[in-house]
């Protein structure tokens, strides 16, 4: 199957809101975030092509996708800029890029293990892998600069092992992704091209998260649910250009939740 379509998305309120969110640092300097009311809407031409196979308790697909994007919106951290007479040490705002290109391949596989003897015939395996290449370009005073498409990992994989039979629905899943660009930076002493050359661009490091989900159906109306997210306590790590230049390190821990669902 194949498809071609156009899409349009307007900037979010926070991206276009001219009112600044101002925070004073301990050293007396100011940092803040302010939208850009001159942003153009995000426009994209999309093309998808895939081949799919449906078997007895199994599914497989392989696809190619391509997106030609205009006016993608990027956060831009600007150093030492003045707004309404107030000097900001760092101001995060938003800009449109000119042209962006994204293309890649996706593989999906799902297999029920119903050939196994009871009670193991409720087991299944699901896998997904996507590899993507994406770039954006921006016209500046001294030419055109090119950089990775924002928040787009080159490789993303997902694997789940589960059991779905009778009253039980159990899943253990792992999601992995490679690093991606978080936002651009603009040091007032350098051009954006020099910032790119000097690795003054913030990235989010690769990440793997393992989750466990269990659902038990008591009857047609009532079910119990138990989830464990981020079992291995994987942190989020952000860096400037290379991993040895730390920008931010967050630990969220492992979360546990239990719930009851009742359908009227």
What are these regions (language model features)?
Residues 65-68, 86-186:
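Gram-negative outer-membrane beta-barrel transporters
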Residues 123, 176-191, 215-264:
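C-terminal beta-signal and adjacent terminal beta-strands/loops
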Residues 13-19, 25-30, 64, 72-79, ...:
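Outer-membrane beta-barrel translocator domains and adjoining extracellular loop/strand segments
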């Amino acid at each position: 199957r194949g498809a071609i379509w156009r899409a349009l998305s307007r900037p979010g309120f926070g991206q276009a809101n001219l009112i600044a969110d101002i925070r004073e640092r301990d050293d007396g300097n100011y940092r803040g975030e302010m939208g850009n009311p001159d942003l153009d809407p995000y426009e994209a031409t999309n093309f998808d092509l895939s081949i799919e196979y449906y078997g007895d308790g199994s599914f497989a697909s392989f696809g190619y996708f391509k997106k030609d994007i205009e006016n993608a919106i990027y956060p831009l951290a600007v150093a030492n800029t003045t707004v309404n007479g107030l000097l900001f040490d760092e101001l995060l705002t938003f800009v449109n890029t000119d042209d962006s290109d994204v293309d890649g391949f996706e593989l999906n596989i799902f297999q029920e293990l119903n050939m196994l003897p009871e009670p193991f015939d409720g087991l299944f395996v699901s896998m997904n892998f996507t590899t993507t290449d994406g770039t954006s370009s921006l016209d500046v005073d001294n030419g055109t600069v090119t950089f990775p498409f924002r928040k787009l990992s080159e490789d993303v994989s997902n694997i789940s092992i589960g059991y779905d039979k009778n009253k039980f629905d159990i899943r253990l899943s792992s999601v992995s992704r490679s690093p991606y660009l978080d936002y651009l930076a603009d040091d007032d002493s350098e051009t954006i091209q020099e910032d790119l050359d000097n690795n003054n661009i913030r990235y989010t490091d690769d990440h793997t998260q393992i989750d466990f989900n269990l659902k038990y159906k008591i009857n047609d109306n009532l079910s119990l649910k138990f989830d464990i997210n981020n079992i291995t306590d994987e942190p989020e790590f952000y860096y400037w250009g290379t991993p040895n230049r730390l920008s931010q390190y967050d630990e969220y821990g492992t979360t546990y939740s239990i719930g009851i669902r009742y359908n009227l």
